[in-house]
């Protein structure tokens, strides 16, 4: 590096034993002007601060080279790793410095290895477009987005140079798109149940999912055909549509006594649109068109039909670390539903619901989970739409949906201990109640429940046995094997 000199020459002269060296140096000129071209990402005044020499000072070529490297480092540290100094010259006659920066604008983006998935369905997951400056952070996020669709076994990126501009080649390897799932579970409330799910996970190569699902058991049946898309064009808006038929056999109780048995049939259509929002989680709006028929099977039970047309605004946050037996994270579910004749239905009501639960583990083995639930219903709420209380996950000592009402207040505290790997012992205290009218609420009416249980994480799902007791002498043994569906 010549530093403050523009040129240097050495001349050796003299006889063999009397040699001399003469140096001729040319001083670098005084800085007259600095021109920077090709900059779109930063303010030029900010980049000029990296050039230590000021107008009127003699140019130091070594320092100038170091300053140019600092400008490149500024680009690279910001993720623009393809930026380069395309031209960096000093006019020794005028003292003008010319700097041209190639920021690394993407020449094009190409996808290979896909036989079924449409190219645009892959590229919409990449936040970088042709002509954008190559940003390593955005590229990495795009690769993760593509992989997260679940359509590909592997996703890799290759960067080539085309006319001094980066060309991106995304290589993918597709999973089979047709998926068949079988499952089964048992619990004391519904006995044995099975589930069959058939999914086309890449419908017409667009990344949309079409799923047919059937749940069949002694006391519950579900038949659902659903369509889901995680992207609307290039936005992050998701939507899903489903048509369904549900049939549930339920018991009716008067206090602790079972007095009847009824069958609840639901058939309808739902359309949901939503997206992920910071802090609010998955926010969605659902339109529901549904017919509900309640038929008496035995004893005393409600009967009738309801035609429901409703809109539901919902926010869900779920960052639990695992299922089952989570050890950290929280689960929040908040929604507000409005049904009325203006929407084409026969029932007019408003329902609001909030469920908040937190998991935290201490000393690796002890997990605490507080939970709070609140529900409110106003208007002509059909029996089938009322809140319920009871069951292994809901309220110890009572059976599933043993109590119903338009107003719900409930809280619980669960303590779980990791006895061995995959073996858990737990206890839980529940407090809560249901009321048909607001004016019926009294603190003295709150019910109390307490229980203990043992759970095992098995290859076929959780196996749990619990015992619970509640107010007024209610006692219940619970047992279940398999994942809930």
Regions found by a protein language model. Give the residues of each.
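Post-signal-peptide, soluble extracytosolic/periplasmic N-terminal scaffold domains
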Residues: 1-101, 116, 120, 126-129, ...
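A generic beta-sheet turn/junction motif
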Residues: 14-16, 27-29, 92, 115, ...
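Short, charged/polar, Gly/Pro-enriched secondary-structure boundary elements
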Residues: 27-34, 103-109, 174-182, 232-234
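Extracellular/lumenal ectodomain signal focusing on beta-strand-rich modules
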Residues: 33, 87, 108, 154-156, ...
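Gram-negative/organellar outer-membrane beta-barrel architecture
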Residues: 41-45, 62, 70, 116-120, ...
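C-terminal outer-membrane beta-barrel translocator/porin domains of Gram-negative envelope proteins
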Residues: 179-182, 300-437, 481-484
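A short alpha/beta connector and helix-capping loop motif
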Residues: 440-453
